[in-house]
Amino acid sequence: MNHFPKLLSSQIGFDVAQTMLEYFDRHYRIFREAAVDAKTLFERGDWHGLQRLARERITSYDERVKECVEVLEDEYDAENIDDEVWQQIKLHYIGLLTSHRQPECAETFFNSVCCKILHRSYFSNDFIFVRPAISTEYLENDEPAAKPTYRAYYPGTDGLAVTLERIVTNFQLDPPFEDLTRDIGCVMQAIDDEFGHFDEAPNFQIHVLSSLFFRNKSAYIVGRIINADRVLPFAVPIRHVRPGVLALDTVLLRRDLLQIIFSFSHSYFLVDMGVPSAYVDFLCTIMPGKPKAEIYTSVGLQKQGKNLFYRDLLHHLSHSSDRFIIAPGIKGLVMLVFTLPSFPYVFKIIKDHFPPPKETTRAQIMEKYQLVKRHDRLGRMADTLEYSSVALPLARLDHALVRELEKEVPSLLEYEDDKLVIKHLYIERRMTPLNLYLQNGSDADVEHGVKEYGNAVKELMKANIFPGDMLYKNFGVTRHGRVVFYDYDEIEYLTDCNVRRVPPPRNEEDELSGEPWYTVGPHDIFPETYGPFLLGDPRVRSVFMKHHADFFDPALWQASKDKLMQGELPDFYPYDATLRFSVRYPARFGATGENDGAGDAQRAA
């Protein structure tokens, strides 16, 4: 600190720090209560309740920040506190965190509050936590009644089958299992299929995180197998095979499969973590290479993930020299998109003006992005990080990009010394645009991309999402080969749409007309008209009609809408249906496998 206070003499400084921590503690208490409630809702099979709980939790953080800011302004006139006291506030806050179980998240909460009160000129480590102050290494809750972060099991003592059964039953889920012995047998067979026979080393053990991970209609057991110097990750999803009866659905034993269920295109898990940094450290051991920012986000601590991401960006900028450039591909009508080639993300800014035929506003587009944030993304919609007042070094901006920014978003720019401050932007994982993937790919790539595209749109419609603009350029291909939607300015709930067939032409003039001969309402959709936009490439057309000929039939869309209107929530699985035990080992299930919906499994990883 440039001017470290020699004496922490300000009572206001201590009171403000304590107030901020009290509001963070309130936030985290609500966060944990949501995870506890998720277990109850899962046991009851209350899927609508789980959806509602997940949506409410997303907004809870901002509500606590807003409440805290209002108290600080009303009781302490926070905007007029002088610089020396603000420095003391931070130091008092650090002192209050020395034995805290969530210090990194509390520091982020401090930043969130300060950013609402202080001018951005104060956004330095003197006043906020640009860098962390409290270490989270080896942090555990050592209170006698507290759950450990993970439990260790030793199969060498009682055998693997008994150990696996104990792992499952220790979670004390209320509904009974249909046939836990059968399911444990499937787990053991899957382990043997994946790894074959392996010699048990003296340190052979299984570590299992103490809390279940809830999302959609599944509860996941997450852990790792330790044997000699090998660390083998696993996740076991538990599902209701029918109301009030549970089963282990599969076991995921490959790192890439775990990375998909923890990916940026899925909604956040609800998981009860007394010490979140310990959970994240554990998850890093089974998904090495996955940024901590993404893991914090996936377990529901998206503000901490956002904070870590920004630190990662600043660190990368200080250790790289390439320039931000306009993103390659077809330019959008609504968003200006740029990227830093050495950094695997894109930066998206809403333009000041939209040319015809776009009829929307900045506020409406921002609401669409919030809709996606709150909605179940099912592995088919990219998560976004939203930032305000992002300062980028001018020397790192390509001249063509600066000209484009000044042309398209002048209202969002401020020049500040050697930096360009962008008042508002979104950041997303960079993907290969699907149109380029199909254009440049082999025949096998085209088949994969088209099949994935159709699956993605069909899964989105079953989740009550109509993408609006379904051109290939609005979808991307992830590094795992998944097709993900990422252009949200025309997104709508399918239940708000009016699915229509194209009326037959009234005469030859109608038939030859390039314009519709029928009225089109603002929420009307005509699936039969999508073909000319999607099937122009002969390779694409052939594969599309092979896998998704029903895509252009309004009946498909209307059937999904009807089920949604009746309150149905379809089953989705963030792994291939062929991995499900009932599909993979049908002989173990006999007649019981007929009722578990295996034939209708949707792949939504």
Curated annotation (Swiss-Prot):
The catalytic residues are D383
Q: Which InterPro entries match?
A: AceK_kinase, AceK_regulatory, Isocitrate_DH_AceK
Q: Where in the cell is it found?
A: Cytoplasm
Q: Which molecular-function annotations from GO does this UniProt entry contain?
A: [isocitrate dehydrogenase (NADP+)] kinase activity; AMP binding; ATP binding; phosphoprotein phosphatase activity; protein serine/threonine kinase activity
Per the UniProt entry, the Enzyme Commission number(s) are: 2.7.11.5, 3.1.3.-
Binding-site residues for ATP, renumbered to this chain = A327, P328, G329, I330, K331, G332, L333, K348
Cite the entry's keywords alphabetically. ATP-binding, Cytoplasm, Glyoxylate bypass, Hydrolase, Kinase, Nucleotide-binding, Protein phosphatase, Serine/threonine-protein kinase, Transferase, Tricarboxylic acid cycle
* Pfam families xrefs: AceK_kinase, AceK_regulatory
Q: Mention any one GO cellular component term assigned to this protein in its UniProt record.
A: cytoplasm
Question: Which reactions appear under catalytic activity for this entry?
Answer: L-seryl-[isocitrate dehydrogenase] + ATP = O-phospho-L-seryl-[isocitrate dehydrogenase] + ADP + H(+)
> Organism's domain of life?
Bacteria
GO biological process terms, alphabetically, are: glucose metabolic process; glyoxylate cycle; tricarboxylic acid cycle
- Per the similarity annotation, which family is this? Belongs to the AceK family.
Q: What role does it play?
A: Bifunctional enzyme which can phosphorylate or dephosphorylate isocitrate dehydrogenase (IDH) on a specific serine residue. This is a regulatory mechanism which enables bacteria to bypass the Krebs cycle via the glyoxylate shunt in response to the source of carbon. When bacteria are grown on glucose, IDH is fully active and unphosphorylated, but when grown on acetate or ethanol, the activity of IDH declines drastically concomitant with its phosphorylation.
Q: Which NCBIfam families match?
A: PRK02946.1
Q: What is this protein called?
A: Isocitrate dehydrogenase kinase/phosphatase
| Species this protein is from | Burkholderia cenocepacia (strain HI2424)
Q: What is the lineage of its organism?
A: Bacteria, Pseudomonadati, Pseudomonadota, Betaproteobacteria, Burkholderiales
